[in-house]
Structure formats: structure tokens, C-alpha cells
Amino acid sequence: MITFSIITCTFQAEKEIQRTLESVAQQTYPHVEHVLVDGASRDQTTTLIEAYIAAQRTQPEALHRTVYRSEPDKGLYDAMNKGLQRATGDYVLFLNAGDTFPQTDTLEQVAGAVGEGEMLPGVLYGDTDVVDNTGRFLRHRRLVPPENLSWRDFKWGMLVCHQAFYARTDLAQCTPYRLQFGLSADVDWCIRVMKMAEQKGLVLRPIHAVVVNYLDGGMSIKHHRSSLKARFHVMRTHYGLLTTCAVHLWFLIRSFLRK
């Protein structure tokens, strides 16, 4: 049976963290560790996490292991790197505070995509629904994952949501987030993981199901302009300046035609 490390990084997340903790705890798949990395929050985030862990210890039927640390960091992706270092599962998934699994058997569905005794795929990936801060469905994510994903596909945008991207932990730990890419460090990371999977001859496998409810209004949306600049830098790094400019020109033309 494959194992999962679910990494949740928090900072001042008292309004969102409880939903995510409960969603992970409700997963019926047993082979899960939840790695919680807090950036020394000053609100009630750490209190809520510590209460959750204490409650788990009183429940002998609790299915999952929880790993937790709170300390200052250099931002979200530095915290994610700390989480990667602590991950011990076969696959790692980043689930931000406020994000949830759509079903209690979501991880069972993901695990079921890997055959018994099969060489583990490099990446497992699925679809995404966008929800509001009450968990109400808003829309299906506009970008739809392709059937046969390649790192080259990301030149057209982040076709798989970061929170729907299950990377083999050994690949992920060899490709830590590069902080110089700012709010688009997740795009760069996904591309590099897929490149490494290709180099090792590992498949990228679709799940054909919604695997995450993504909380609307993430950091890249709140800081849209700086995120776009960082993303252009990522695209240029992986696909070259000419291809990146051509793709962005097409984005502009398409946007104009839709008006």
C-alpha cells in the first residue's frame, strides 16, 4: 500500500486551518502522515493545531500520524521546503490552510490508481474544484489537466493545480522550491519534478476525478502582478525567451478575441 505525506504550511491561518485539519482526519485511507509547518503564527493557529494533535492522541482509532513544528521561516516556499524535508510517505501533496479533500475517500481513489507491485508513477494528478471560505462550490477550475501530461505542457499555464499534484517524495526532495521565483515557485517546482520523472522513465498518471477543493483567493491572486512577472521568469527559464514571448502573445490575442 502506498503512503502519503500531506504537507500544510500555515501563518496566521486561524480562520482556515480547522477545515483542513478535519478534512485530512476524515480520510478513510490509513497510510497518511500530516506534516504541519507553521511560521510562528501570532493568532490562534498554533493553539488550534495543538488542540487537534492533543485530541488525536486520545483517540486510539485515529488513522493518521501528525508531525508538527512552529518556527519562523522565510515565507511560504521556505516552509514548504521544511515540510519536504520531514516527509516520509511515497507521495507528497501540499494542502494549504482552507483547502480540503472533496470526499472522505479521495486518498483511496488516488492510491487506487497505482497497481499492486507496480513501479510508482512519478506524478499522480487530478482535477480541482474552487470553493469559498465556507466550502461552497464556486466553479470547476478553468484549466483542465490533459490525459497525457508532460512538463512541456506547462508553457500554456499551470494545467494542474499545485494542490492536485501528487509528486513522488524522492523526486520532490531532490527538487526543493527555488525561492527566487517568488509566488511562482510552485510552477517551477512542478515543471522540475516532471522533468526528473521523464529523465527516470516514470509515467505521469491522471486520476480522472476531482481530488481537491481549492480555497479561492490564494497568494498569487492577491498579488497578481508580481505573480505574473515571476511566472514569466519561470517560463523563460524552462522554455526559452522566444517560446515564452510567443505563448504570451497568444494569450493577449485570445483575451482580446473573447471580449
Where does each model-flagged region fall?
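A conserved acidic beta->alpha catalytic loop
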Residues: 30, 38-48, 96
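Cell-envelope/extracellular polymer assembly enzymes that use nucleotide-activated donors
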Residues: 2-5, 33, 188
